[in-house]
Amino acid sequence: MGYPGKSHKTYDRPRKPWEADRMANEVELIKTYGLRNKRELWKAESILRKYRRVGRMLLASKARGEARADIEAAAVINRLSRFGILKDGADLDAILSLKITDILERRLQTQVYRQGLANTIRQARQFITHGHIQVAGQRVTVPSYLVKRGDEMTIDYYAGSPLAREGHPERSSKIVARTGGSA
């Protein structure tokens, strides 16, 4: 056992480091979602792996007829649906069918780009790390922050940021059109 106050790795490296198909898939995901390195992708895979493992254990518990299985399954499904990873009313089989893109779509970096607050996925990352983005009134500077479904509509430019002004040249043309300003 280790010291509980010490930070530990939140990801596992691939067992076969030079597998060509996996490497090509990773590069494509990194380009699509604007990740800086494969470690960020491996962290998302670890999150997915954890929930799929829990889903398998809960399915086995239900098959054995354990009483707590239904309560624990409802809690896990509720948590994943709060983050927008699962749809409302999903079941345990839906957890097993999750893909890595379901996790990556919930990152703040992806949400900022999809909502049109940035012109590119890389610009979205820059806006976040420079403190130009807020979620529910709080400045967030972590691109990998997983956005809850309820907070999705509260993503906006930070009030103290120069980007909050309508005429700022770096503002996305989509957001200017959405707010009624002139582009």
Swiss-Prot record:
* SMART domains to which the protein is assigned, alphabetical: Ribosomal_S4, S4
In terms of domain of life, where is this protein from? Archaea
- The positions making up the signal sequence are none
Q: Where is the S4 RNA-binding domain?
A: 106-168
Q: Does the keyword Ubl conjugation apply?
A: no
Q: Which GO terms describe its cellular component?
A: small ribosomal subunit
Q: Which Pfam families match?
A: Ribosomal_S4, S4
Which key words are in the record?
Answer: Ribonucleoprotein, Ribosomal protein, RNA-binding, rRNA-binding
Q: Which GO terms describe its molecular function?
A: rRNA binding; structural constituent of ribosome
RNA-binding is among the record's keywords: yes
Write down the InterPro entries for this protein, in alphabetical order. Answer: Ribosomal_uS4, Ribosomal_uS4_arc, Ribosomal_uS4_CS, Ribosomal_uS4_euk/arc, Ribosomal_uS4_N, S4_RNA-bd, S4_RNA-bd_sf
Family (UniProt): Belongs to the universal ribosomal protein uS4 family.
Q: Which NCBIfam families match?
A: PRK04051.1, uS4_arch
What job does this protein perform?
One of the primary rRNA binding proteins, it binds directly to 16S rRNA where it nucleates assembly of the body of the 30S subunit. With S5 and S12 plays an important role in translational accuracy.
What is annotated about its quaternary structure and interactions? Part of the 30S ribosomal subunit. Contacts protein S5. The interaction surface between S4 and S5 is involved in control of translational fidelity.
Q: What is this protein called?
A: Small ribosomal subunit protein uS4
Q: What is the lineage of its organism?
A: Archaea, Methanobacteriati, Methanobacteriota, Stenosarchaea group, Methanomicrobia
Which gene carries the instructions for this protein? rps4
